[in-house]
Design a protein with these regions (language model features):
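Short, flexible helix-loop junctions that flank or precede catalytic/ligand sites
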Residues: 2-375
Length: 375
C-alpha cells in the first residue's frame, strides 16, 4: 500500500518534469492529425510542407490553388516531418533522396488512405501529402456536366468497342470522370472491366483494378499488354504516356474492346495530333477514336459568404469547382475529312470559352477566375 501511494504521488511530478524535447515528440502526432483533419474539412486535395531556412511553410492545394496555412518552427517541423515519414513507412532519417509511401487512414483517423511523397530541395526537404477523394464515387449526372455531355458519355459507355479519350492539364478532373464512368459501367453490369491506374484512388465494386509499380517494372504498357490476356471487355488506362501504350489502346479499341484513357493535350485537335505522332498506323487511330472530352475546372463562388471571406472557403471567396468542357464525337464523314486533311478540320461541340461565359452569366464564378484558368 505504501508503495502504491508513493507511486501515485510521484506521477504528477514525472508529468510536469517532461522535457521540451519529449513534449515536442508527443505533440507531433497530434499536429499531423490536426493538419489532415483541417485539410479534409476544407476539401483540400494536397498538403504541402516545405522547409525554408529555420522553418517549414505549410500550404493546402484547395480547388487547384495553393493557399498558405501556417508556419512551423524548425524543431516542430523536424518532428512533424519525421512523424509523417514514419506513418508512411519511409526512412525517417533520409532527406537527400525522394521517397514515396502511403499512410493507412486508420492510423490518423482520416477519411481515406493518404499518399506521401518527399523530395530534397535547395532550401530543405519538401513533403506533399495527397488526400484521396471521397470514397463515394459521383455519378456522371453529379459532375455538373451539361446534359449533352452526359448523354454523349452514357451513349459511348453502352457501346461494345471504341476509344474514349479524356484530356486536360493535371488537376482538371479527368480521374474523377473516369471513376464516374466506372461506376456507370458497374451499375450497367454484364461486363468484365479492368483498369490500369497510378495510383488506385477509389475502389469500385465489380471492377478489376490494377495499380502500376514502376519500381518493379510494372508500367502502363506492360500492365495493359498482359491484361488483354485476362479477357477484358472494357480496358481503362489511367494515362497514355508512351508509344507502346498508345498502340495497345488503339489496337484494343479496334478488336472489340471498349477503351477509356487520358492523354495530355491542350485541345480535342491536340489529342489527335499527339496520338497520330505516337502511333504507327494513322488510319487505325482515326478509326479507333469515338469520343474526345477536353476539360478544365473553374472555382465556384463560395455560396456561404458571397464573396466576403469566411471559414468555409478559408478566406478565398471560392468553394468547390465546376467543369468547363468541350467535346468531339467522331462520325463517319468526319473520319474521312481527318484522313484527307488532318486534325485541323476538327471543330469541337461547345467550347471552353463558351462554357465559361455561361457560368459568368449565372454568376457562379467571376472574370478573374476565368482568366486564371483559360488565360
Amino acid at each position: 500500500m505504501e508503495w502504491l501511494e508513493a507511486t501515485c504521488a510521484s506521477a504528477p511530478n514525472r508529468l510536469t518534469a517532461m522535457t521540451p524535447t519529449e513534449h515536442l515528440d508527443n505533440s507531433a502526432p497530434k499536429r499531423v492529425e490536426q493538419l489532415i483533419r483541417q485539410a479534409e474539412h476544407s476539401g483540400a486535395s494536397d498538403i504541402h510542407l516545405q522547409m525554408i531556412g529555420k522553418a517549414a511553410e505549410v500550404a493546402f492545394r484547395l480547388d487547384g490553388v495553393m493557399i498558405p496555412i501556417s508556419t512551423l518552427a524548425e524543431d516542430v517541423a523536424e518532428r512533424v516531418f519525421g512523424r509523417i515519414k514514419f506513418l508512411a513507412r519511409l526512412k525517417t532519417y533520409q532527406d537527400s533522396l525522394p521517397q514515396d509511401g502511403r499512410i493507412d487512414k486508420a492510423t490518423v483517423g482520416a477519411q481515406n488512405d493518404i499518399r506521401v511523397a518527399t523530395y530534397p530541395t535547395v532550401t530543405g526537404e519538401k513533403i506533399v501529402v495527397r488526400l484521396f477523394a471521397s470514397s463515394v464515387t459521383k455519378s456522371l449526372r453529379e459532375l455538373d456536366y451539361p446534359a449533352e455531355v452526359c448523354n454523349e458519355l452514357e451513349s459511348f459507355l453502352r457501346r461494345n468497342s471504341g476509344l474514349l479519350l479524356l484530356t486536360g492539364p493535371a488537376g482538371s478532373g479527368k480521374t474523377t470522370t473516369i471513376y464516374s464512368c466506372l461506376r456507370f459501367l458497374a451499375e450497367l453490369g454484364g461486363r468484365h472491366v479492368i483498369t490500369v491506374e497510378d495510383p488506385v484512388e477509389q475502389i469500385i465494386p465489380g471492377i478489376m483494378q490494377t495499380e502500376i509499380n514502376e519500381a518493379r517494372a510494372l508500367t502502363f504498357a506492360k500492365a495493359a499488354r498482359h491484361l488483354l490476356r485476362q479477357d477484358p471487355q472494357t480496358l481503362v488506362i489511367g494515362e497514355i504516356r508512351d508509344e507502346e501504350t498508345a498502340n495497345i489502346a488503339v489496337h484494343a479499341a479496334l478488336t472489340g474492346h471498349m477503351v477509356i484513357a487520358t492523354l495530355h493535350a491542350g485541345s480535342c485537335q491536340g489529342v489527335f495530333e499527339r496520338l497520330l505522332l505516337m502511333c504507327e498506323d494513322s488510319y487505325a487511330v482515326v478509326s479507333a477514336v469515338q469520343l474526345v472530352l477536353n476539360q478544365r475546372l473553374i472555382r465556384r463562388r463560395c455560396q456561404h459568404c458571397s464573396g466576403v471571406p469566411c471559414s468555409v472557403c478559408l478566406s478565398t471567396g471560392y468553394h468547390g469547382r465546376i467543369p468547363l468542357v468541350e467535346w468531339f464525337r467522331v462520325e463517319t464523314t468526319m473520319r474521312a475529312k481527318i484522313r484527307n486533311h488532318g486534325p485541323g478540320v476538327i471543330e469541337p461541340q461547345g467550347s471552353l470559352a463558351q462554357a465559361a461565359r455561361e457560368l459568368l452569366d449565372r454568376q457562379l464564378s467571376d472574370e478573374s477566375e476565368v482568366k486564371r484558368v483559360l488565360g
